[in-house]
Swiss-Prot record:
Belongs to the bacterial ribosomal protein bL17 family. It comes from Streptococcus pyogenes serotype M49 (strain NZ131). This is Large ribosomal subunit protein bL17. GO terms for molecular function: structural constituent of ribosome. GO terms for biological process: translation. The lineage of its organism: Bacteria, Bacillati, Bacillota, Bacilli, Lactobacillales. The keyword Ribosomal protein applies.
Length: 128
């Protein structure tokens, strides 16, 4: 089988993977279960590869998957207003150029201690 079910229906699983992928692109490091980390690694690698392509079609494909969440918000004193950056903008303007010379392997999974409540194997997934 090419993917893990993660104990969810297909729509729930797809939504969870989209959320975790978006969170990883925004925060660049998240703590989750080992199985989830191994699954979102696939989607994050695809999103960064789309970001490296950088054309309109790649941007639209990434926009169809990445949630429209605010990645950062800055105050511009000269214009007296707030400017925000979405996860998609961060992917194409900050993350993708960082990996321009790298062919794959954009993420790292570090195993940590089991979760206290149910002893689920936990891991930290981060961008290299």
């Amino acid at each position: 089988m090419a993917y893990r079910k993660l104990g969810r229906t297909s729509s729930q699983r797809k939504a969870m993977l989209r959320d975790l992928t978006t969170d990883l692109l925004i925060n660049e490091s998240i703590v989750t279960t080992e199985a989830r980390a191994k699954e979102i690694r696939k989607t994050v690698e695809k999103m960064i590869t789309l970001g490296k392509r950088g054309d309109l079609h790649a941007r639209r494909q990434a926009a169809a998957y990445v949630r429209n969440e605010i990645a950062s918000e800055n105050y511009d004193e000269a214009a007296d207003k707030y400017t925000s950056t979405t996860a998609l903008q961060k992917l194409f303007s900050e993350i993708a150029p960082r990996y321009a010379e790298r062919n794959g392997g954009y993420t790292r999974i570090l195993k940590t201690e089991p979760r206290r409540g149910d002893a689920a194997p936990m891991a930290i997934i981060e961008l290299v």
